[in-house]
Each structure stands twice: as structure tokens, then as C-alpha cells.
Amino acid sequence: MNETKFQTKINSEIGELEAVILHTPGPEVENMTPRSVERALYSDILNLSVALQEYEQLSLLLEKITKVYQVKDLLVKVLDNTAHRNSLIGKICLTENVNDYYDELMEMSSRTLANKLIEGLPARIDSLTSFLNDEYYALLPLYNFYFTRDASAVVGNNAVICRMAKKISVRESLIMEAI
């Protein structure tokens, strides 16, 4: 694996950016339902096509002045490393109480796994109990992940991983910590 080591260093709020990490909104936004709006901390369902247009403009602007990294691409690189994959999936399964999905997640390709971790993993319906469960997802979509500044930040020479108050956002911090 070709790893790039990042030097995290911010000495100014107004200095030149050397790189940014973005997460372009995707299917996780479309997976939002009227029922999940409140849990996702929204007042309404987002229009993905509008959000994508705005994000494309932001990304194009940033690409003119700095290096832009996409969360999903960085996550795929993390998941290509077996030790990092085991650690991240173990933490996610433990935190979100989905230990019975560990093997299924570990068997996925890195790209598929990155997609499922962000877009959501539908729950198995293999029993009457799971059929009657109100929740469609074993791993909820990360509706808010395009706010990458919420889960992590750089202060001086250190990356600060924020612990999110809402359970739905904890996986965002775990992913950013792994990256």
C-alpha cells in the first residue's frame, strides 16, 4: 500500500491552506426518511442534487487553491490495511452493538465496506424479531458526514478527534480517527 504521511500543522486561522478533507454527500443523504430527519438533526430532508451542485462548486474552488482529499478515498486506503480494518470494524461493531455483522463487514471489499460504513448497512431480516424491528439499518447512514469539521479538527500539530454527542454521529469520529 502506498501510504502518504500527513503533517498536521495549523498555526493560523487565516493562513494558506495546504490540504482539506471533504466528504461529498451521496446516497446516505437519499437514505434519509421523514422518520429519520429528527434523529439526523435536520429540520427537513435534503435535496441531494442541490447539495451535490453546491459541494461541486466548493470542491472546484478549493482545488484551485489547495489539495483536496475525499474521506471515502482515504477510508478505502485505511481499510486496505488488515490491522486498521480489524480495529475500525471492531470499534464500530462494539459501539453500535452490531457484533453479529463483524464477519460480513470484514468480507467486503474495501470500497464496498467504505460505502456501507457511510451510506448505511441494511439490517438482515432473518427472524421474526428482525422482521418486526422498526429499524431498517444495522448501521445507520451518516447523514451529517459532509460536515467533516464536526468529527475532527487540527489544532497546532495535533489532530483532534471529537466525540459526538449523538449516537448517530459516533461512527464519523471513528472513521476520522482511523484516517
Segments and roles (model prediction):
Residues 1-179:
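The feature marks the mature, well-folded catalytic cores of soluble enzymes
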